[in-house]
From Swiss-Prot:
Its EC number is 6.3.5.-. Allows the formation of correctly charged Asn-tRNA(Asn) or Gln-tRNA(Gln) through the transamidation of misacylated Asp-tRNA(Asn) or Glu-tRNA(Gln) in organisms which lack either or both of asparaginyl-tRNA or glutaminyl-tRNA synthetases. The reaction takes place in the presence of glutamine and ATP through an activated phospho-Asp-tRNA(Asn) or phospho-Glu-tRNA(Gln). This is Aspartyl/glutamyl-tRNA(Asn/Gln) amidotransferase subunit C. The keyword Ligase applies. The gene is gatC. It is an enzyme of class 6 (ligase). It comes from Pelobacter propionicus (strain DSM 2379 / NBRC 103807 / OttBd1). Pfam families: GatC. Keywords: ATP-binding, Ligase, Nucleotide-binding, Protein biosynthesis. Belongs to the GatC family. PANTHER family: GLUTAMYL-TRNA(GLN) AMIDOTRANSFERASE SUBUNIT C, MITOCHONDRIAL.
């Protein structure tokens, strides 16, 4: 499957990215190469291979939750351009 400029524009729109024409060309080639590697993996014969979810045989490496000193709200918000009621105000990203 060949990645087109339209495919790159679609992905960029989903990611809310603005790309130049040069970047679109570059990313189309890079995405095409990456998907080519995925197609190679599809050719592998995996009959008789046990499915795995982890590369290392390790399960649930838990640690104790411990509180540690932090910077505090006032210091965290010190450089915030528009804090509101002790929180960061950020631009709306979902329409």
């Amino acid at each position: 499957m060949k990645i087109t400029i339209a495919d790159v524009e679609h992905v960029a729109r989903l990611a809310r990215l603005e790309l130049s024409d040069e970047e679109k060309q570059l990313f189309a080639g890079q995405m095409d190469t990456i998907l080519g590697y995925v197609d190679k993996l599809k050719e592998l014969n995996t009959d008789g291979i046990q499915p795995t979810s982890h590369a290392v045989p390790m399960e649930n490496a838990f640690r104790e939750d411990q509180t540690r000193p932090s910077i505090g709200t006032a210091k965290a918000l010190a450089n915030a351009p528009d804090p509101v009621l002790g929180f960061f105000r950020v631009p709306k990203v979902i329409e």
